């Protein structure tokens, strides 16, 4: 071959290899060099202008600080920071927003009237008064308070005894200090040789309610092995103590009984003596290993590929200003009660209000076991603070990676404002499911559909062992959905017995019983269906025999509608076990284009509830749990179905939800629906290390029922439609075909950060 030709070929080969290497190298770095996806703002409609109203906004740090300064000045020099307070001290327990009266709020929102005065509700523990008590004070106007008024009697029908006060962090600290410094030293040999206690390897978990009579403050406390990085809840050791901590001076607290392996003792000194003389049957419990079953550390090395992630290539189709959220379809404001948790207000679809308030009211768990601590558990989690215990959410796990994270500020259990960073997230959820679709082959060939998506606001309450994921979801159909998932650690008891222990759950570890329990969640739905005057209507279907019109000798069983207007509250109260109409909705006298009353249907997603028997002395405090659904007249004097004061006094509640049902008329009134969603949990091996969200979800839907003239999602811009003779691969025909073009850009992703530990 000619040398020049050979050199030319070698040169071309070198250039080709160089070009290929360049392409490969640049493609490997193409992610960082690709253009950013263009951010397309949400579509503008008359109803999408965000409300400037701050009626329902949580108190700002400045407002919280102003209220604390005002209270400190006006309640006297004896006020102590709650974070250091003893039971005998006076302290400000909590400060949060005092919600305005609905009439005043609507006068402002709907008729342009002046906004109601912004006020705070403060809870004061007066442990230092001659007659210790709990008082509730309304403080205003904000942001510059000048007055306070005592609303305790107005809200609770009388003074609040001091023993009803919720447990605060300082009391838990004082309880553990008392046990470690006063009680545990009475049994050093037993604790060291049987439970491997070295001064730091045990932790207390407590039961509530405290005591069996009004005025009691005596709590069963179980000890668990506590190793850093492990779930303490899965490591019971079998030792439990009944501590009376009702005295104002912790020095006067006393252990009334001790429980160990099915037997009761006067105190730990007796237990120690019986152990030393060889009369005590024991089960030695080794310390758990750091990599054991209760650890949430990954069992495998992280290895690509990553799990699927959800991105919005063109940016979110919603705006958040303060606590107001607007989208092309929905507007609402959200709040975060310190005790009740997530709530949303003034919820409108295309500018028309659907509901004034949808909120969490209570979260109840009731346990069974053969140990005193576990069998006495009736946790009312609002008393611990569903909002206070809403911790920072993790991008890409707790919420989609692109979610908008919202900080929350609270003041409870301390004299200063506490930041809960990223405790609420807002995002659009693509559910991987068609919202509607049809493939037609009869009389024509076409396809039409719309991918399902929703606007979601979420928070997670980590109360003790459980984590509750609260979602309010707003759909393009005009439906509003509430759902709660339960996850976290189960509560366990030590298996000291044999088969009798299995009456209360399943064995989930070495001498560890997963204790059976019930979950019940209560919600308030203040619906305003096309106005304040609503009716409750129940519809169902029954089969009726009918002769075929074309041949009377033929018989058919034909479904036929039944319809009943529920005129009184007692007719709209449905206890568990009673049949709930399959269609129950709130309606207005206005009609749609087809002559039907415009309405919103309440559809509950919950298994049958398991409620505390009516003969229980605790039941009246939990009476909301009797009912799967109740509709009552709305009253300012009935704002909540539960109370944070019930946790420590279930046997003499001041206000009872069942008394809301007093047979008043429901015809053309402002109505509130109260919904209970619940499930039974029998823990099993697959609840270790954590209960998973799959299968542990309940909630409800508010669905338009003849509220519109057609499905409003037909106007969604993401709708897909094409016929057989059209090229569905063209972006101009099918918006989904544009996806490939969008995929050439890089979505705008925030950097990962976390401040929640």
Swiss-Prot record:
Tissue-wise expression: Significantly much highly expressed in retina.
Subcellular location: Cell membrane
Residues that coordinate or bind Ca(2+) 2: 569, 638, 660, 662, 664
UniProt-listed Pfam families: Cu_amine_oxid (PF01179), Cu_amine_oxidN2 (PF02727), Cu_amine_oxidN3 (PF02728)
Signal peptide: none
Binding residues annotated for Ca(2+) 1, in chain numbering: 526-528, 670-671
Essential cofactor(s): Cu(2+); Ca(2+); L-topaquinone
InterPro entries, sorted: Cu_Am_Ox_Cu-bd (IPR049947), Cu_Am_ox_TPQ-bd (IPR049948), Cu_amine_oxidase (IPR000269), Cu_amine_oxidase_C (IPR015798), Cu_amine_oxidase_C_sf (IPR036460), Cu_amine_oxidase_N-reg (IPR016182), Cu_amine_oxidase_N2 (IPR015800), Cu_amine_oxidase_N3 (IPR015802)
Record-listed E.C. numbers: 1.4.3.21
Cofactor binding description: Binds 1 copper ion per subunit.
Recorded topology in the membrane: Single-pass type II membrane protein
Positions glycosylated per UniProt: 133, 198, 226, 663
Keyword presence, Ribosomal protein: no
Disulfide bridges in this chain: 399-425, 731-738
2',4',5'-topaquinone, modified sites: 466
Catalyses which reaction(s): 2-phenylethylamine + O2 + H2O = 2-phenylacetaldehyde + H2O2 + NH4(+); tryptamine + O2 + H2O = indole-3-acetaldehyde + H2O2 + NH4(+); tyramine + O2 + H2O = (4-hydroxyphenyl)acetaldehyde + H2O2 + NH4(+)
Biological function: Catalyzes the oxidative deamination of primary amines to the corresponding aldehydes with the concomitant production of hydrogen peroxide and ammonia. Has a preference for 2-phenylethylamine, tryptamine and tyramine. Could also act on methylamine and benzylamine but much less efficiently.
Subunit structure: Homodimer; disulfide-linked. Probably forms heterodimers with AOC3.
Protein name as it appears in the record: Amine oxidase [copper-containing] 2
Gene: Aoc2
